[in-house]
């Protein structure tokens, strides 16, 4: 996969994208990363990338020319996903990360200031994505967050493919509780089932914990999850236990 970032602050990406999984993905030729400062594509001697909005209003708007010019220098095809980071976009999710992990080429347009000239949105962009109902100073942090979520899903990046399959949201539920040594710490012990060596019982316990954890922390996900009769019985027993205290 190749990822290009159009940004006014390319140095922001240096630390995040050159460590841990991102670094290994690049070293193993699973990922190619390129940052482009679209200020270099401004059309006047002052390298101006923003201007006042037509019709009046507060703030500055990113001009179309630098972004369009920068895009012309990229190897963009009809299959390239061009992503605009903006509050009005589709909320980012694990499902969206899975979809984007199958792309060969992604371009993130990371804006600043009040917003973008609408012609950028309507003529260059394939996806508008939001990280939530709040506003950030620029698109760089959301782009880096999305990159991490996407790249770890590329086959061969994590090494152990089971790793991301056990993650929260991978099957619509939150992840089960995890434990490691020591077996007992400050009077707190690891559940016996995890030490039993019985993998069927361990899998059943983990699924039960995922259901209960999701029910407690993200009831909206439980409403969407295709509960089996066995799942419903697990949750019903849990609810009865809560009432009994």
From Swiss-Prot:
Coiled coil: none annotated. Its main location: cytoplasm. It catalyses: guanosine(37) in tRNA + S-adenosyl-L-methionine = N(1)-methylguanosine(37) in tRNA + S-adenosyl-L-homocysteine + H(+). GO terms for biological process: tRNA N1-guanine methylation. InterPro entries: Alpha/beta_knot_MTases, tRNA_m1G_MeTrfase_C_sf, tRNA_m1G_MeTrfase_TrmD, tRNA_m1G_MTases_N, tRNA_MeTrfase_TRMD/TRM10. GO terms for molecular function: tRNA (guanine(37)-N1)-methyltransferase activity. HAMAP family: TrmD. Specifically methylates guanosine-37 in various tRNAs. Homodimer. This is tRNA (guanine-N(1)-)-methyltransferase. It comes from Staphylococcus aureus (strain NCTC 8325 / PS 47).
